[in-house]
Every structure is written in structure tokens, then in C-alpha cells.
Amino acid sequence: MENSSVRGAATYAGVALVAALLGAAAMWMHAEKRVNAARSQSTDAVTTHGEWVKIKRGKDTIRAYVAYPERKTKAPAVIVIHEIFGLTDWEPTVADRLAKEGFVAIVPDLLSSRHGQSPKNQDEARKLIGELDPDSITADLNAVYAYVNGLPAVEKDHIGTIGFCWGGGQSFRYATNNPNLKAVVVAYGPPPDSAAIKRIQAPVLGVYGENDERIDATLPDVAAKMEAAGKTFTHEVYPGTGHGFLKPGRQGSDGPQVQKAWDRILEFYRARLGK
């Protein structure tokens, strides 16, 4: 009788696991279809090749979107780190934009390895993001770095990052943990701990909105600490824009400052990563 109960419990657990995996797979497929539909509206996607990949990290799997430029030679690469809302329709279009400019770009879903599915809404995304621990995020980014650095189309060790909002903070923080990065872009993200700044090896470019005092108030302090530590930190504050202005629907996102910011970002990458 006891063995029967154990077998029954094991069977139930197995069925539950399969159901969870199938549910996660269905969520991934739905999210990918949604993103692909958004990409179809972007002119950048016409001149690039994009695909979804799964990256193993121990027993976990990281879902990611990779965009490739149309070029004959190997390309530098950029890791794109999403906002606090998780991987949305927008970040893959950022990857397409970078690919159109000659870079291989990869966007990992940093919730996929921990939770196996995309959040249903922004509130759930914030909650799930809040449950991620820094070491896990670093491990995921290390796996993504190793993956993209091993791609035949990528110029080995010519890799940078860009992150937005929460992802901007992660881009800055990841620079303290990966000395091999060659260029780091922080789009309106918070700085890392003061002690960690000493570990940064890559030059850092900050992109900020004028009407974002919560983040902008940290700039004098972080600039002073980066300079004192002998690190390269340049930043631009764009007039008439708010937090998140590089993403459609945010304050200033429909103005000329967006193109100016992207021009500066691309100039920085070409100088630090190559063309």
C-alpha cells in the first residue's frame, strides 16, 4: 500500500513537471510570435537575420534572441539587457537596430532560467525581477557572454553591453564582474556599489534623460568615484527627455534626442569594439 502511494505521488509529480514544462514552452512560443510580429513592423529587421536560441547554464536554460548583420567579416557583439518589465517586444528591435549597424546583438530573457516563462504583465515582471539575486544574474550573463563569444560570426573578445532602466544598472554592475568587456553602455540605470567600481575595466558611457532626477542625482557622485578609481566614464544628459526615453511611449521618445543618443552610442561602440 505504501509503495502504491509512493508511486502515485511520483507519477503526480512527473505529470506536474511535464505540464509545467509544456506550459513554459507554450508561453515562450507565444512571446516569440508576439516579438516576431513586432519585428515585422521594423525596417531594421529587413536587413538583418534574427533567431531564437536556448543557452544552457548548468541545469537551467536561458532563452535569448540573436540578431546578425549582413556582412562578410566577423562582427563585434553587444549583449542587450532588458528593463525591469522583462523581455518585451521592444528589446529584440534594439538588437535588430544594432545588427543593422554591423553588430551581432543578443537579448537574453533573464527571467527564463529562474522561472521558465514570460511574465503575464508588468506587475508580475517587477515581482519576478525582484526575486532574482545578483549572483544568478551574473551567472546568466556569463553564460550569454560565453555563448556569443563562441559564435563563428563574432570577433572574439570584442563584446560590449547595453542595458535600459533596471538593465542599465545590470549593465553597469556586470562591468564590475566581467573584466573582459570592452564597452559598457548604461541607459538611465543606477550605478554599482562604490567598492565594486574599482573592478571595472571597460570604458562606460551613460545615457540619461533630463527629467529623471532619481537617477541623475547619482551622476556627480558616480563620476567622481569613477575618476578617482582611474576609470573611463562619460555621460550625456538629453534635454526634454525622461526616464526610459529610448523606448517608444516614454517622455521624449518621439523627439530628436533619441537619434542623437543612438548616434552617440554607436560612435562609442565603433571606437571601442570596432566596426
Mark where each language-model region is.
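Short beta-strand/loop motif that positions the catalytic acidic residue
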Residues: 200, 206-208
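Generic structural signal for well-ordered alpha-helices
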Residues: 141-145, 219, 223, 266
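An N-terminal hydrophobic leader/cap segment in hydrolases
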Residues: 4-55, 62-65
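Primarily recognizes the serine-hydrolase "nucleophile elbow" in alpha/beta-hydrolase
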Residues: 141-201
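Serine-hydrolase catalytic machinery in alpha/beta-hydrolase-like enzymes
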Residues: 39-46, 52-150, 247-249
